[in-house]
């Protein structure tokens, strides 16, 4: 039996992984083939310019690759809630992931996930 994963083109999406902290979050954007779009972006929670730039980066990737995005925020206490609401109010498909799930899906001992969170979440959602 083959271990190949076959994707339905109607189900492809851009994955946006956000590692949420108290004062700032790290955002990474990945394509369905697990290639990253640009560098991780630091979102400052108290800066409207930073929040606007994050939204612009997501929309730019959606337009460039003609795919919708799905945003996955790692739940960190209550710190994820304002960012979740902001992005949802901007029209994005957002989900909050329990950090225990993301930490249990890898054997890599990393305190902060940053870039890896996108790949971990994609594996959880697509069972790659």
Give the location of each predicted region.
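Phosphate- and other anionic-substrate recognition elements at nucleic-acid/protein interfaces
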Residues: 1-128
């Amino acid at each position: 039996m083959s271990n190949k994963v076959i994707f339905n083109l109607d189900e492809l999406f851009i994955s946006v992984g956000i590692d949420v902290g108290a004062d700032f979050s790290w955002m990474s954007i990945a394509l369905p083939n697990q290639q990253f779009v640009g560098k991780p972006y630091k979102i400052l929670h108290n800066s409207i310019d930073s929040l606007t730039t994050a939204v612009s980066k997501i929309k730019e990737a959606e337009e460039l690759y003609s795919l919708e995005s799905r945003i996955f925020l790692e739940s960190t206490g209550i710190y994820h809630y304002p960012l979740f609401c902001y992005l949802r109010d901007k029209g994005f498909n957002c989900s909050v992931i329990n950090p225990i799930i993301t930490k249990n899906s890898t054997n890599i001992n990393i305190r902060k996930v940053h870039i890896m969170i996108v790949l971990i979440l994609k594996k959880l959602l697509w069972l790659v």
